[in-house]
Amino acid sequence: MQTLTQHLTSQAVNDSLSHLILTLADTSKAISHAVRHGALAGVLGATEQENVQGETQKKLDIITNDMLKDALKADGTVRGLASEEEDHVVEVRQNGQYLVCFDPLDGSSNIDINSLVGTIFSILPAPAGELTETSFLQSGRAQLAAGYVLYGPSTMLALTTGQGVQLFTLDPETNEFLLTNAAMSISPETQEFAINMSNQRFWEAPMQTYIADLLLGKIGPREKSFNMRWIAAMVGDVHRVLSRGGIFTYPSDNKDPKKPYKLRLMYEANPMAFLVEQAGGKASTGYETILDITPTHIHQRVAVILGSANEVDACLSYHGIDSHK
């Protein structure tokens, strides 16, 4: 099996980008160790702090954020970083080539119940000149690489550099990421969907109708039965989609009119959309393709519908969108 280093060389990824990807991968090994030692190390539970989104921070949110910040500051290629846990962008070094956006511990509310969590990252080119928040406001099409690390029964890294999606598994004996799937591919058809049904009464009418038709199964207009899955961690739900197809959606809702969207564009939706498109799937807000959005701020939120291409198209048709035009 190829190691991650060997794979990056075989794909002719340039040295500086390879170095940065390896830094992120190495840090994820340390995060995996911290996650597995959670209760034993006394790092489970919440703090009294909130992040910029107003969410209570878990102890491991802060620990993993600091681990990534420290590693990226030492990497030598990074111009600046943006994190879910940081109010503002962080300048790293003036001659850095890359910007890194990340969610250090996606699904951290799962940590206290020993369920799936992960790290999501996006790498962008650093524009010339002074580093400001505007430097980061590039569409998802500008991403040079993106991926996630899933901390589950095994630790897995899904990665794209624009040449398909590869899956690596951390070998606990050698502490190396080994290539275990050279070409992840999302089947266009599916009978699985993932959504937080507790928000159903708050969704827009198109999404309510779409899900209602899925639940009707064979006796409804879709004429086939669907199964629902929900892990409550985007990294886990998207991993399932990449592994066996499906549609994942976190639509807009009016539960809190000031916060109609849940997922962040820069370090959740964009990297996942890049992975999904590279694996043959589609990713949309319901009204526009995620990777085509020009961000307005680093913590911008969006609706997300992604996964098997034909099922995403079906969902979009309920929103009055003809994806074939």
Swiss-Prot record:
- Which Gene3D superfamilies does the annotation name? 3.40.190.80, Fructose-1,6-Bisphosphatase, subunit A, domain 1
Name the source's superkingdom. Answer: Bacteria
* Amino acids binding Mg(2+) 2: 103, 106, 268
Gene Ontology cellular component terms for the protein in this record: cytosol
The cofactors required by this protein are: Mg(2+)
Tell me where in or outside the cell this protein is found: Cytoplasm
Enzyme class, broadest EC rank: hydrolase
Q: Which InterPro entries match?
A: FBPase_C_dom, FBPase_class-1, FBPase_N, FBPtase
Question: Binding of substrate: at which residues?
Answer: 106-109, 196, 262
Task: Name the positions where Mg(2+) 1 binds.
Answer: 84, 103, 105
Q: Chief subcellular site?
A: cytoplasm
The entry's free-text remark on the cofactor is: Binds 2 magnesium ions per subunit.
- Read off the Pfam families from this record: FBPase, FBPase_C
Under the subunit heading, UniProt states: Homotetramer.
Provide the family line: Belongs to the FBPase class 1 family.
Q: What is this protein called?
A: Fructose-1,6-bisphosphatase class 1
Originating species: Shewanella baltica (strain OS195)
Q: Which gene encodes it?
A: fbp
